[in-house]
Amino acid sequence: MAITPTQLLDWKRQQRPIVALTAWDTAIASVLDAAGVEIILVGDSLGMVALGYETTLPVSLDTMIHHTAAVKRGVQRALVVCDLPFLTYQESPAQAMGSAGRVLQETGAQAVKLEGGHPRMVETVARLTEVGIPVMGHVGLTPQSVHQLGYRQQGQDPATAEKILHQAIALAEAGVFAIVLEHIPSELAASITEQLPIPTIGIGAGPQCDGQVLVTADLLGLTVKQPPFAPAYLNLRHTITETVHKFSGEVRQRQFPRRG
């Protein structure tokens, strides 16, 4: 049975940690789903990790729909959440509704994720949730605001910490079913987690969040530059390189294919 946003709320009350990872294709999505991952996020980070862009900004809605549909075809149980990419929801609630509607109708994903917690974004979230579109929030470091905020840790001083807290509370009141807390001090994340009735999903936000999310390529050691808050559990880049070298050597020495 597929996981629902309501189950995540139950797990928050039960203090059961939630596991989330990213996927952009059917193969990886099916592995994550079979391994018991509860949330599979089709993140616009695919622009940087899979498509070679320097930021997430060039990623289009059509690209996200293409990859989310591929992910959903490989998933039976996990909750699939799709990032709405840059400038596909910020203009107005009507624009956001059109983008979110396309995602849900064309991919089968169960929810969308929006970045930011300023008043207009809170209004947009409220409009989406009013019509039954499940929304995941995202505050702290928001990659779509890279040219304004950069990639540094957010919420380090009392004023910005208070701002992030108030944004998280406002988003929860607007109806998000969960919220990503990215690259903020662990004390701030713990405070937000304690005050919100919805699950917090941390990435570089300490261990006290209700769940954790990582970019799967970072987890597996596929990326060239590892984020400071994302330790690699495997050096898959090295493993793939060695495997390709072995295959190449056998081809060049005419040892492949082996005579059976």
From Swiss-Prot:
EC number: 2.1.2.11
Cofactors required: Mg(2+)
SUPFAM superfamilies hit by this protein: Phosphoenolpyruvate/pyruvate domain
EC primary class: transferase
Cellular localization per UniProt: Cytoplasm
One annotated Gene Ontology cellular component of this protein: cytoplasm
Chief place where the protein resides: cytoplasm
Pfam families given in the database record: Pantoate_transf (PF02548)
GO BP, one annotated term: pantothenate biosynthetic process
Pathway noted in the entry: Cofactor biosynthesis; (R)-pantothenate biosynthesis; (R)-pantoate from 3-methyl-2-oxobutanoate: step 1/2
Keyword S-adenosyl-L-methionine belongs to the record: no
Chain sites annotated for binding 3-methyl-2-oxobutanoate: 44-45, 83, 113
Catalytic site positions: 182
Protein residues bound to Mg(2+): 44, 83, 115
InterPro entries registered for this protein in UniProt: Pantoate_hydroxy_MeTrfase, Pyrv/PenolPyrv_kinase-like_dom, Pyrv_kinase-like_dom_sf
Keyword annotations: Cytoplasm, Magnesium, Metal-binding, Pantothenate biosynthesis, Transferase
SS bond list: none
Subunit structure: Homodecamer; pentamer of dimers.
Function: Catalyzes the reversible reaction in which hydroxymethyl group from 5,10-methylenetetrahydrofolate is transferred onto alpha-ketoisovalerate to form ketopantoate.
UniProt record similarity statement: Belongs to the PanB family.
Protein known as: 3-methyl-2-oxobutanoate hydroxymethyltransferase
Source species: Synechocystis sp. (strain ATCC 27184 / PCC 6803 / Kazusa)
Gene name, Swiss-Prot/TrEMBL: panB
